[in-house]
Amino acid sequence: MGGGPRTFPGGLSKWQHKRMHEKLARHKERGLLRHEKQLYLARLRSEIRASRLPAAGASPPDDGDGPTSSRAHIRALADRFLLPGAEDLWNEDDGPIHRADRPRPPRRIVSVGGNGGDRRKLDSTKQELPRGGKEPRLAAFNPRRDFQTAAPWWWQWSSSSAIPSRTKEASFCFFGPKRSYSVMPLFQAHQESSGTSMVPLIARGLASARIAPSQLNGERFYSFAAGRFGRKLRPDSSDEDDEDISTAKKDMRFARFGASSEEESGYDELEARSAIRKKWSSAALRNCDMKKERRALKSYEEENNDLAGSFRELREEIKNREVLGAERRRYESRGESLFTNKRFEECGISPLTVKALTDAGYVQTTVVQETALPMCLEGKDVLVKAKTGTGKSAAFLLPAIESVLNAMKSHTNHRVSPIFSLILCPTRELAIQLTAEANVLLKYHQGIGVQSLIGGTRFKLDQRRLESDPCQILVATPGRLLDHIENKSSFSVRLMGLKLLVLDEADHLLDLGFRTDIEKIVDSLPRQRQTLLFSATIPKEVRRVSQLVLKRDHVFVDTVGLGAVETPTKVEQLYLVMPHELHFHMVYRLLREHIDQEVDYKVIVFCTTAMVTEFMYIMLRDLKLNVREIHSRKPQLYRTRISEEFRDSSRLILVTSDVSTRGVNYPGVTLVIQVGVPSDREHYIHRLGRTGREGKSGKGILLLAPWEEYFLNEIHDLPVQKSQTPNIDEEMKRKVDGSIKIVDMSIKEAAYHAWLGYYNSIGDVGRDKTMLVDLANRFCKSIGLEKPPALYRKTALKMGLKDVPGIRIRK
């Protein structure tokens, strides 16, 4: 048999071969189910049509409620694409158009004339009227005739000033290109006994002629005055021959496109017939191909109620803003104090939780806690905006614990242990931090557990941990939580008992990157729940999208205030503008200067991408600085270890990407350096918020290239000042260049590709591809590459850089 592993055709392994056949079996099963569904629908349609057929020997129903014909079915399908108010030129009695190359129809000779011998033959194809003062008898005309006309055409009486009468000789003229038509006659013959005959009355003749409405039984006509097309169904009558022209014009209408108020009474039968057609066409299609009905307009009372409710909500929001503004001014007058005079014992929370807070050193509430806790504990949906480092985590962890305690008091028996509180956060580091803080608050609570679900760990281990150690509070990232919901049915059952949903850093979770996952998660949660949203920045778009998870009567708590600065007031904000080739030299210069000034320094350096972060870390490490790195390319165990080390240490530098931007609490950070333009204003605020926490002082420096100065317009309302450019001596420049050279070539190429992708995604830079490639080539030289690395063809196509000069394509 051989000693190697067994393979199947195509080089597949045993498991690949098995999965392939399982996939083919599922595909075949879906096809059989689809075919069976089609047969069922066809049989159902046949039964519906058969049930509407008249019984054998019975007369067809007189209400026209029988099965639809093929012509009516096609007509109903075409009506679906007719826009409201458009004119329909469909004429069901029109036949096929005869082209010029077809033989002309034979002439029809009919007899016209009076009662005596004054009768002669009339050629119907020439459309002439006999001479002699007599009108033609139309009884001999066939119900269908073919003739040629000119288009455009109209009839012209021989004497335009005279009124045509029954004794007056009339003629009509044609001019224009010929067209062939096959139409039904406009008028049928009248009974000879009535002594009345008709001539076609159109254009000017209609204005003064008298007609008998009995001549118009079930036929089509055109009215210049009304401008409508339609079908008029009237009973035969000969008593109205002497009506005036207004009655005649009123009766001569086409009703295909509706009628005025005086016309509506005569079209009941036509509307009934149209309704029958639509009804049977939809039945044949089993309601699968119907137009969507327009939303009905609200009544006057409903509009007034909605308007009154909107005004009531607006008054409440204005009142809340005034209260919050007064409180904010009171705290500002006390000197920007973070804590208030209110103690946690006065907030109505569990004494065991208060005891745990006291042991941790927290006795008084902060501004956001004092404002948001009463509303959260009342069970309302709340959207909270507060500055970074003001105690938002405790403001939603305390209501989460209280919701679990209230749910456990009900003593309801559950088959599985339910999850009462769910906390979602965007990053793994933030989830780990919130889990640790929740464990501190649950120190004296017995029987309440908290766990975290984050990426970077084994899925089976998470399942085993959730089953062996059930929890009531779950902290998770959206991606890993969605994996458990979709792959583990028992986990979805546990979420059915949810009482509280919390979205920390809600603006980021409701952004385009996470919105799809959040929508799927919310769909799997019970609707009867409380939802809390917390963030330091809440743009207008997030306020609008927040309706996906919040109730309509939710409360918006803004502790920042309108027109207030969103960044910590004790943090000094500076920016530097330098050529991109000197950015790495300037970072080293700023770090050396800060280390000399601060004894217990603690610095965070934010880079644009993960690979640029790794490049910066290797360069600074070679320059003998005490530096660590965290970015998305590192395994989760490494990231957790470095995060804990940086949190508990001082005299340390952390080089990181945006994974450390939001929510992570690193106490005692003295300096934040942002290298390159942030992706948006919110990222700048959250990065800067890593320093100046809990009311302490700090410093932030933004390092930009000359072509990145556009970003200053987005933060013009923040107290950012331009700093004096420090000098870089030759010795320092030589040392940095030497450290750049020792970085591995693969890391440099990866940094170039990542830099190009990042700035290509920023609209202000990525619009001009030629300029973007030129800037990328400058960055390439700044990291020690002589020529830009080649891109894969697929990557260049995705980025829109395939034919841009300066881009090298890998062959």
Swiss-Prot record:
Tell me where the sequence motif Q motif sits in this chain: 342-370
Q: Which residues form a coiled coil?
A: 286-333
Tell me where on the tree of life, at the top rank, the source sits: Eukaryota
Q: Where is the Helicase C-terminal domain?
A: 570-740
Keywords from the named record: ATP-binding, Coiled coil, Helicase, Hydrolase, Nucleotide-binding, RNA-binding
Chemical reaction(s) catalysed: ATP + H2O = ADP + phosphate + H(+)
State if Nucleotide-binding is listed as a keyword: yes
Gene3D superfamilies from the UniProt entry: P-loop containing nucleotide triphosphate hydrolases
Q: Where is the composition biased (Basic and acidic residues)?
A: 95-104, 117-138
Among the GO molecular function terms of this UniProt record, one is:
RNA binding
| Database matches in InterPro entries | DEAD/DEAH_box_helicase_dom, Helicase_ATP-bd, Helicase_C-like, P-loop_NTPase, RNA_helicase_DEAD_Q_motif
Q: Which residues bind ATP?
A: A386, K387, T388, G389, T390, G391, K392, S393
Motif annotated as DEAD box, chain positions = 504-507
Which residue ranges have biased composition labelled Basic residues? 15-29
Q: Where is the Helicase ATP-binding domain?
A: 373-556
Enzyme Commission designation: 3.6.4.13
What SUPFAM superfamilies does the entry give?
Answer: P-loop containing nucleoside triphosphate hydrolases
List the residue ranges of the region (Disordered): 1-32, 93-138
Tell me the domain comment: The Q motif is unique to and characteristic of the DEAD box family of RNA helicases and controls ATP binding and hydrolysis.
Family of the protein in this entry: Belongs to the DEAD box helicase family.
Instruction: Report the protein name in the record.
Output: DEAD-box ATP-dependent RNA helicase 48
